[in-house]
Design a protein with these regions (language model features):
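Second-shell loop/turn segments in exported
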Residues: 22-33, 89-96, 118-124
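Stable alpha-helical elements in mature extracytoplasmic
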Residues: 33-43, 99, 103-106, 127
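Active-site neighborhood of HAD-like aspartate-dependent phosphohydrolases
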Residues: 50, 56, 67-98, 105, ...
Length: 129
């Protein structure tokens, strides 16, 4: 006899459930984000002081989960029992992702010091603009 899988069982088995819950509810998530960007800020200050006349310094970051938090997208994937590719482009076009804690202030500060900022992404070109 094959038992019918309930939606709750599918949700519990979804591969990104724990990571998504962590991003939503763990105090450590926000603290670690701020810590990472504070360390990055310290490094940019050090580089700027060490090489004050250098004009070509750059910061390169990935967009998703480094600058933008896609937890709402991940939660939706869990809720509808879907996986990454099925509606990623739709999510990107909606432009609903919020910044990762600390990202905006760090990037504004780095920009004010004259750092060139480059973003890496697997998003389609239309979704990045």
């Amino acid at each position: 006899v094959k038992q019918k899988t309930t939606n709750n069982a599918k949700i519990a088995d979804h591969p990104i459930l724990m990571a998504t819950l962590y991003n939503y509810f763990a105090a450590e998530y926000q603290a670690l984000c701020y810590q990472a960007y504070n360390v990055a800020k310290e490094r940019t200050i050090l580089l700027h002081k060490t090489f004050p006349k250098k004009k070509n310094m750059a910061i390169v970051l990935d967009i998703d989960e480094t600058v933008l938090n896609n937890s709402p997208y991940q939660a939706k994937m869990i809720q509808i029992n879907a996986h990454y590719d099925s509606c990623w482009n739709t999510w990107c076009r909606q432009a609903d992702a919020k910044p990762v804690p600390g990202a905006v202030s760090f990037l504004k500060y780095a920009d004010s010091l004259g750092f060139n900022i480059f973003y890496v992404s697997n998003r389609k070109e239309k979704a990045v603009k």
